Structure formats: C-alpha cells, structure tokens
C-alpha cells in the first residue's frame, strides 16, 4: 500500500511531500482511539524481550524516531501511532527561524539516501513548548533536540542552548544537545573538547535547576576521526551525560550522483557503516559504560541488529522511514525478534555490544 503512496509523493518535491506527510500524521493524531489502535497493531510482533531501559527510560523496543522529521512537535501522537518506542522532536532553537533557502531537501532513491540543508528551520522553543503542554498521550519517551540560532555568534551559543533547556526540558523525557549539524555555520566546532565541555557543563547546570535528573544526550557527527570520538566520549563521561546519539548526517559523498554536489548533510544507506564505526569506537572507549543511541542508514531488522551488536542500546530512524513508510516498525520487530532468538539472545540488552565480547563469554 505504501509503495503506491510513496510513488505519488515522490512525484512532488521532497519538502512538499514532507509537509503533506506531516499534515497527515498531525490529523491522525487528533483521534486518540485510532492512534492507540494503530500502535497496538504495529507492536503485535514485539515480545517483552525487545524492551530496553536507557538512562532510566523504558523503551518498548529498540526502534525509535530520530529528530528532524517533526521539528515543531506537530505530529507526535501520529508518530507514536506508527509504533516507534520513542519520538524525538527538533532541532529547536530559542527563536523561530526560516532555515536555509529552498530547494534544501533532495532525494537520491538509487542510493536510498537524502541530502538536506534545512538549517534548523523551526517555529521556536516557546511554540513547541505550548504544543507539548497540550499533549495528553505519551506511550513512550519523548526527546527534545536543541540547537542554536543561525545568527547567534558561536561564543554565545551556550546562551541559546540554556534558553532551550528552560523552555523545553521540563516537558520532555530527555534532552539532546545537537552540536553536529553541518547546516549551521561553525556549529561542529562545538564538538571540540574545550568548547564541548563548557557547553555541556552549562546545560547540565541549568538542567539540575529546571528539570533535575533529566537525562542529557549529545548528538555527534559521523565525520569525527577515531581520536576525536575518544575525546568526545571522555568529555561526555566527565560531564556525566546519559549517553551519545551517533550519528548525525555526513558531509562526505561516497558516490557519484548529479545531486552529490549539493551542500548539506547526507543521510540514509551510505551513512550506515560510518555511523556503525563511530558507535563501535565510542562503545570501546567507554568500555560499554556510556549508553549509545545509534542512527544512520537503518531500513531493516538486520540494520537494527548490527547497530545493537556494535554497541547501541536503542536505534533511531529517519531516512528509512521516508522510504519504508508508516509500516516500518511493524515490519522490523518480528524479524528482529527472530534474529535475537536465532543467536540465542533472550533480550535486547543481551546483544548490546555483543560483537566486542570474546567468543564463549557470557551474554
């Protein structure tokens, strides 16, 4: 069914199709009964062994939605109806901003990929907070992904993140510092150890005041060198973060394509292995002590399974959802359960980081 819908949507520009899809999910969310029914159907193939706990949050299964799809918390209920164990909104900034000029979103179907240079387009933290206050149904964790406004000087970026914490942290279940988007000039410099430590320290300090105990995650780029990943992990642990989200989009172009010259972040299948490499490195650096939410190139249960084995505790999707449609979660879960059983794992937590364990070691 979605194949036909996708064919029609793919006749439109990528951004117009996105707006139509979000509008549909928004209107779906107006019917609580329908949302609950659809979610129940999507989770039929999710046995209890698929549940996992990260930073004190319970995920019904390890397949969650990444930030970027619902920037303004307009379709949270409709997205939960699709079966996601968690939904992450944003990236949100203190003040509304239009983002970069269009066209700014491009499909590359033959590579199962997207290129975007959206530029943190959003209605601002205050408006998103108002929507979250009206929410009455939350069957799983809701994450709030925050960033800085484009016109905020880098040396004042901390103020923007703290302002977002004030507005949004009490309303979400976890907070994500996005310091890795390639579409806000200079933003990735915040991943450098000294600046990152200052930023995370300030955010943690404010969180302790406005939302004590709220888990804080950091979203990082797939383009970091192995040594840079080590530095980020060390800073994250020093600042007592709940975990990392690995990874954002890449500026690399590992193929020839007419659209490859377009500026922006590449997501989808080409990011799968670079993201997995960052997950492995981060897991090894922390000895498995720092939880990781893996994202990048997830389309199938096998993709989810590989990220879990590499060290992720939860796996997020975005581009895969665009290509696979609203039935994606329901299609993945039964096969994921089969993969776990095939390899002798009774629970998701048993397979996390499994590829790093020596043969014969206990699960």
Curated annotation (Swiss-Prot):
It is an enzyme of class 1 (oxidoreductase). The active site is at residue 181. It is found in: Cell membrane. Pfam families: DHO_dh. It catalyses: (S)-dihydroorotate + a quinone = orotate + a quinol. GO terms for cellular component: cytoplasm; plasma membrane. Pathway: Pyrimidine metabolism; UMP biosynthesis via de novo pathway; orotate from (S)-dihydroorotate (quinone route): step 1/1. Its EC number is 1.3.5.2. GO terms for biological process: 'de novo' pyrimidine nucleobase biosynthetic process; 'de novo' UMP biosynthetic process. It is a peripheral membrane protein. Substrate binds at residues 71, 116-120, 178, 183, 248-249. Binds 1 FMN per subunit. Keywords: Cell membrane, Flavoprotein, FMN, Membrane, Oxidoreductase, Pyrimidine biosynthesis. Its cofactor is FMN. FMN binds at residues 67-71, 91, 145, 178, 219, 247, 268, 297, 318-319. Its main location: membrane. GO terms for molecular function: dihydroorotate dehydrogenase (quinone) activity. Belongs to the dihydroorotate dehydrogenase family. Type 2 subfamily. Catalyzes the conversion of dihydroorotate to orotate with quinone as electron acceptor. Monomer. This is Dihydroorotate dehydrogenase (quinone). It comes from Myxococcus xanthus (strain DK1622). The lineage of its organism: Bacteria, Pseudomonadati, Myxococcota, Myxococcia, Myxococcales.
């Amino acid at each position: 069914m979605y194949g036909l819908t996708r064919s029609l949507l793919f006749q439109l520009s990528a951004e117009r199709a996105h707006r139509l899809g979000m509008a549909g999910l928004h209107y779906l969310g107006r019917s609580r009964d329908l949302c609950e029914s659809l979610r129940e159907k999507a989770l039929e193939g999710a046995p209890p062994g698929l549940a996992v706990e990260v930073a004190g949050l319970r995920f019904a299964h390890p397949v969650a939605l990444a930030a970027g799809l619902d920037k303004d918390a307009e379709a949270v209920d409709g997205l939960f109806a699709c079966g996601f164990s968690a939904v992450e909104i944003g990236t949100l900034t203190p003040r509304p901003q239009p983002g970069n000029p269009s066209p700014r979103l491009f499909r590359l179907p033959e590579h199962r990929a997207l290129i975007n240079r959206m530029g943190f387009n959003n209605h601002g933290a205050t408006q998103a907070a108002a929507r979250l206050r009206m929410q009455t149904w939350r069957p799983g964790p809701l994450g709030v992904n925050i960033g800085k406004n484009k016109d905020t000087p880098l040396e004042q970026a901390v103020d923007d993140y703290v302002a977002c914490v004030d507005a949004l942290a009490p309303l979400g279940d976890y907070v994500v510092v996005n310091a890795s988007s390639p579409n806000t000039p200079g933003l990735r410099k915040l991943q450098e150890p000294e600046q990152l430590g200052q930023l995370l320290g300030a955010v943690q300090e404010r969180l302790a005041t406005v939302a004590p105990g709220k888990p804080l995650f950091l979203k990082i780029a797939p383009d970091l060198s192995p040594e840079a990943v080590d530095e980020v992990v060390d800073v994250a642990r020093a600042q007592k973060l709940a975990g990392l989200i690995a990874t954002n989009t890449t500026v690399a172009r590992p193929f020839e394509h007419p659209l490859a010259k377009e500026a922006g972040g590449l997501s989808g299948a080409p990011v799968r292995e670079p993201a997995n490499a960052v997950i492995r490195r981060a897991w090894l650096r922390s000895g498995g002590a720092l939880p990781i939410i893996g994202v990048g190139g997830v389309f199938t249960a096998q993709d989810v399974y590989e990220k879990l084995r590499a060290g992720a505790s939860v796996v997020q999707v975005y581009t895969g959802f665009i290509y696979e449609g609203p039935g994606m979660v329901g299609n993945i879960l039964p096969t994921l359960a089969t993969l776990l059983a095939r390899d002798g794992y009774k629970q998701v937590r048993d397979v996390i980081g499994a590829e790093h364990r020596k043969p014969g070691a206990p699960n």
